[in-house]
């Protein structure tokens, strides 16, 4: 994105890698109750049988804990954990180097697997299914096929764009897990746990204020907590109260629902320039000077989940909640137009 320092971006940053704040077991992990319960069963069953866990695919917006869950799974299985990402595996040799170094039942985590090179993906199929690598050595008439046996491993992959995965790859994951945005109550527990680990006194109201503005995303909650701590320490506050959190986040231009300036530009552009919509994603991307992928992956998911925008066959449309948040009145014809659009959407 053109604004990499955006405070509420769910994309990973160096400061987010603080392992002291990360849960170390499924019992410590807050939220995603159904996914955690199922993973516990699958892990226990694999351990009892002495087998590698089936391959796991995590699907969901960034910042919800896919990497953390993969690390916890390896820890609870009692095996090694290796991590990489789709764009990093440029050629078949890169993947072969990773796979041949795995020991029995190890966990290999591939983030952003939807960005995997298609040529590399072809090599991954037999590795996942038969625990074998089929490599072509040499070129031309001298080329020959070589089969390499692999240790039985577990591939844990993560994607924000399930639709970009090919069907053959998607079908090779025995355990698909969809992660959803967290509730304010779950995020409040995460914030309070983080504050305890930081030895930062905090009231329940202070924790809730941070949680309300964290866009349903633990990674953002942790980042906001660190910045609020800075304000509290400089102000020599005895504890982080609701007032301290509100002042800090307001000064950081994060509003009461977790929107920043880019979110407001998005909503304002649709409201002012296009009468509330419908407007196509390419037009929005051009108007904001942001890549389409960034808008679809980073900006829109939380807005859609919270009911601020509606995706229709003809484009994005602001809802009544969005107009109220902007402090604007929708055009008089908007209600009837939206009704027709939603009928088409059905």
Swiss-Prot record:
GO MF term set: ATP binding; ATP hydrolysis activity; four-way junction DNA binding; four-way junction helicase activity
Record's keyword terms, sorted: ATP-binding, Cytoplasm, DNA damage, DNA recombination, DNA repair, DNA-binding, Hydrolase, Nucleotide-binding
SUPFAM superfamilies on file: P-loop containing nucleoside triphosphate hydrolases, Winged helix' DNA-binding domain
Binding site for DNA: 292, 311, 316
Ranges annotated as spanning the membrane: none
Subcellular location: Cytoplasm
Catalytic reaction list: ATP + H2O = ADP + phosphate + H(+)
UniProt cross-references to InterPro entries, sorted A to Z: AAA+_ATPase, AAA_lid_4, CbxX/CfxQ, DNA_helicase_Holl-junc_RuvB, P-loop_NTPase, RuvB-like_N, RuvB_C, WH-like_DNA-bd_sf
Source organism, top-level taxon: Bacteria
Cellular component annotations (GO), alphabetically ordered: cytoplasm; Holliday junction resolvase complex
Pfam families with a match to the protein in the record: AAA_lid_4, RuvB_C, RuvB_N
Enzyme class: hydrolase
Name assigned to this protein: Holliday junction branch migration complex subunit RuvB
The organism of origin for this protein: Rhizobium etli (strain ATCC 51251 / DSM 11541 / JCM 21823 / NBRC 15573 / CFN 42)
């Amino acid at each position: 994105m053109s604004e990499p320092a955006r405070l509420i971006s769910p994309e990973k940053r160096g400061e987010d890698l603080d392992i002291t704040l990360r849960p170390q077991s499924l019992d410590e992990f807050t939220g995603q109750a159904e996914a955690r319960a199922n993973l516990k069963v699958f892990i226990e069953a694999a351990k009892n049988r002495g087998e590698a866990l089936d391959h796991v695919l995590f699907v969901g917006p960034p910042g919800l804990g896919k990497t953390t869950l993969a690390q916890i799974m390896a820890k609870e299985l009692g095996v090694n954990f290796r991590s990489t990402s789709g764009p990093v595996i440029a050629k078949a040799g890169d993947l072969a180097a990773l796979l041949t170094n795995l020991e029995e039942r190890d966990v290999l985590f591939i983030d952003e697997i939807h960005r995997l090179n298609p040529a590399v993906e072809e090599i991954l199929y037999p590795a996942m299914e038969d625990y074998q690598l089929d490599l072509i050595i040499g070129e031309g008439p001298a080329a020959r096929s070589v089969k390499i046996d692999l240790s039985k491993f577990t591939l844990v992959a993560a994607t924000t764009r399930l639709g970009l995965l090919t069907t053959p790859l998607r079908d090779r994951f025995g355990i698909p897990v969809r992660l959803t945005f967290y509730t304010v109550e779950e995020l409040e527990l995460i914030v309070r746990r983080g504050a305890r680990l930081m030895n930062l006194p905090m009231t329940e109201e202070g924790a809730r204020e941070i949680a309300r503005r964290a866009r349903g995303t633990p990674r953002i909650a942790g980042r906001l907590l660190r910045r609020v701590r800075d304000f509290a320490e400089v102000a020599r506050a005895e504890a982080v109260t609701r007032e301290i959190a509100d002042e800090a986040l307001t000064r950081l231009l994060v509003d009461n629902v977790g929107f920043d300036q880019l979110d407001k530009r998005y909503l304002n552009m649709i409201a002012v320039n296009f009468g509330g919509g419908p407007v196509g994603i390419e037009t929005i991307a051009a108007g904001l000077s942001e890549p389409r992928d960034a808008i679809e992956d980073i900006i829109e998911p939380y807005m859609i989940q919270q009911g601020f925008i509606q995706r229709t066959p003809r484009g994005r449309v602001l809802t009544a909640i969005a107009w109220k948040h902007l402090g604007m009145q929708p055009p008089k014809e908007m209600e009837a137009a939206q009704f027709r659009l939603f009928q088409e959407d059905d």
